Amino acid sequence: MEVNILAFIATALFILVPTAFLLIIYVKTETQNKNKKD
């Protein structure tokens, strides 16, 4: 069974892109909350 490189890349992007997007939003909200508390 051969591993399709394009399918592997597509799967990786499909997982990494939303994860990175959520991380960026999380970090932004965390920094804003810390600034508001101070």
From Swiss-Prot:
Annotated Pfam families: PsbM
Topology versus the membrane: Single-pass membrane protein
Compartments it resides in: Plastid, Chloroplast thylakoid membrane
Protein family (similarity comment): Belongs to the PsbM family.
Subunit-structure text: PSII is composed of 1 copy each of membrane proteins PsbA, PsbB, PsbC, PsbD, PsbE, PsbF, PsbH, PsbI, PsbJ, PsbK, PsbL, PsbM, PsbT, PsbX, PsbY, PsbZ, Psb30/Ycf12, at least 3 peripheral proteins of the oxygen-evolving complex and a large number of cofactors. It forms dimeric complexes.
NCBIfam families, A to Z: PS_II_psbM
GO cellular component term of the entry, any: photosystem II
InterPro entries from the UniProt entry: PSII_PsbM, PSII_PsbM_sf
Protein name according to UniProt: Photosystem II reaction center protein M
Single biological process term from Gene Ontology: photosynthesis, light reaction
Spans traversing the lipid bilayer: 5-25
Alphabetic keyword roster: Chloroplast, Membrane, Photosynthesis, Photosystem II, Plastid, Reaction center, Thylakoid, Transmembrane, Transmembrane helix
Function (record text): One of the components of the core complex of photosystem II (PSII). PSII is a light-driven water:plastoquinone oxidoreductase that uses light energy to abstract electrons from H(2)O, generating O(2) and a proton gradient subsequently used for ATP formation. It consists of a core antenna complex that captures photons, and an electron transfer chain that converts photonic excitation into a charge separation. This subunit is found at the monomer-monomer interface.
Taxonomic source organism: Daucus carota
